[in-house]
């Protein structure tokens, strides 16, 4: 990997830091500082000289945005470390601070006016609190390198956008300090949660199997004859109890309904009788009118000679009727006396 474009004169003898040659987190800070001092004596001399301005020591790369879930990239980017460590550790946090000696900015703990102190003072109080909470978190230890290896120089750090992208998607994201469970309950809580997640899909499956089974009704005949069903009774065997007392309003309402029903039945009967009587009277009137019309239309001849009656045939005798001829005689005065029979 190539070195960055802007490098100071004191970083010429440093070797790049690789993931395989990570320093031992258990080595003390004083011992590691002594080894770095022996390897690069010119570096400390230049830091002690007042001619070197502190602004040139700042890393040219911007600080990436950090989230409360991943405080490790914030410290690495602020101190100019080359690459984000696998996971933060109380021992590894101390290691990150000590690695500032080998960073491209050439920072050491002996110089109080170094850019490391300036950057730490510029941090907001919220970031300081998040860093303090991150130190208190319980995290598995990082892999340790061989004790005989020396802490080499760092590699060029990754871009700020890549660090910010990897921070929220870390698989082993830790909980916030306010939500941390007790030490004894952390493992049991996760196991109970897994059991619930595994047991939940099995419960609905068993219920579905029970619901799918056909329910056989007891006592129901196969032919479907309802009157043979034990649970049902015949209409004649059903007993419908009347209420013990009925309200006065209900009594009056029922009485009014009965009265209206009787009046309507009587009205229908009277209407039927009236129609029958009218029909009978009309028939009698028609008969009387017919007879009157026949008499008006017939031709009457008064037979005064009895000899004609003796000579008349049976057919003629049928049409002869004995009537009162006084009215006719009065209308038509007789011309001769009527023959006495």
Swiss-Prot record:
Q: Point out residues bearing the modification Phosphoserine.
A: 18, 59, 67, 70, 81, 92, 103, 114, 124, 142, 169-170, 200
**Compositionally biased intervals (Low complexity):** 64-73
Query: Coiled-coil annotation: which residues?
Result: 261-304
Region labeled Disordered — which residues?
Answer: 1-341
Q: Which residues carry this modification: Citrulline?
A: 323
For bias type Polar residues, the affected ranges are 105-114
> Where does the record place it?
Nucleus; Chromosome; Nucleus, Nucleolus
| Compositional bias annotation for Basic and acidic residues | 26-49, 130-139, 254-298
Question: At what positions is Phosphothreonine found?
Answer: 66
Spans of biased composition, class Basic residues? 219-235, 307-317
What UniProt keywords apply to this chain's record, in alphabetical order? Chromosome, Citrullination, Coiled coil, Nucleus, Phosphoprotein
Modification after translation is described as: Citrullinated by PADI4.
Instruction: Provide GO CC annotations from the record.
Output: nucleolus; nucleus
**InterPro entries the record matches:** CCDC86 (IPR026570), Cgr1-like (IPR005579)
Q: What does this protein do?
A: Required for proper chromosome segregation during mitosis and error-free mitotic progression.
> What's this protein's name?
Coiled-coil domain-containing protein 86
Q: Which organism's genome codes for this protein?
A: Rattus norvegicus (Rat)
């Amino acid at each position: 990997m190539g070195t960055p474009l802007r490098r100071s004169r004191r970083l010429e003898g440093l070797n790049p830091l690789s993931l395989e040659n990570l320093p031992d987190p258990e080595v003390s800070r004083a011992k590691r500082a002594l080894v770095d001092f022996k390897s690069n004596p010119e570096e400390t001399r230049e830091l002690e000289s007042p001619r070197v301005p502190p602004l040139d020591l700042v890393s040219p790369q911007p600080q990436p945005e950090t989230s409360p879930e991943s405080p490790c990239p914030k410290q690495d980017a602020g101190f100019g470390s080359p690459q984000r460590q696998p996971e933060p550790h109380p021992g590894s946090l101390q290691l990150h601070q000590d690695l500032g000696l080998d960073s491209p900015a050439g920072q050491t703990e002996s110089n109080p006016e170094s850019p490391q102190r300036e950057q730490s003072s510029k941090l907001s109080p919220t970031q300081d609190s998040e860093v303090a909470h991150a130190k208190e978190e319980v995290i598995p230890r990082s892999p340790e390198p061989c004790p005989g290896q020396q802490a080499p120089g760092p590699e060029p750090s990754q871009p700020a956008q890549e660090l910010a992208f990897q921070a929220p998607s870390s698989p082993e994201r830790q909980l916030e300090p306010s939500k941390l469970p007790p030490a004894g309950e952390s493992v049991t809580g996760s196991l109970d949660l897994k059991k619930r997640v595994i047991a939940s899909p099995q419960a609905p499956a068993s219920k579905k199997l029970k619901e799918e089974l056909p329910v056989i009704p007891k006592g129901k005949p196969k032919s479907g004859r309802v009157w043979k069903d034990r649970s049902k009774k015949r209409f004649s065997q059903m007993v419908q109890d009347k209420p013990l007392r009925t309200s006065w309003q209900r009594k009056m309402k029922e009485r009014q309904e009965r009265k209206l029903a009787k009046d309507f039945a009587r009205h229908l009967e009277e209407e039927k009788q009236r129609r029958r009587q009218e029909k009978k009277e009309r028939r009698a009137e028609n008969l009387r009118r017919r007879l009157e019309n026949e008499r008006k239309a017939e031709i009457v001849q008064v037979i005064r000679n009895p000899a004609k009656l003796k000579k008349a045939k049976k057919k003629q005798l049928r049409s002869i009727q004995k009537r009162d001829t006084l009215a006719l005689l009065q209308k038509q005065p007789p011309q001769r006396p009527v023959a006495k029979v």
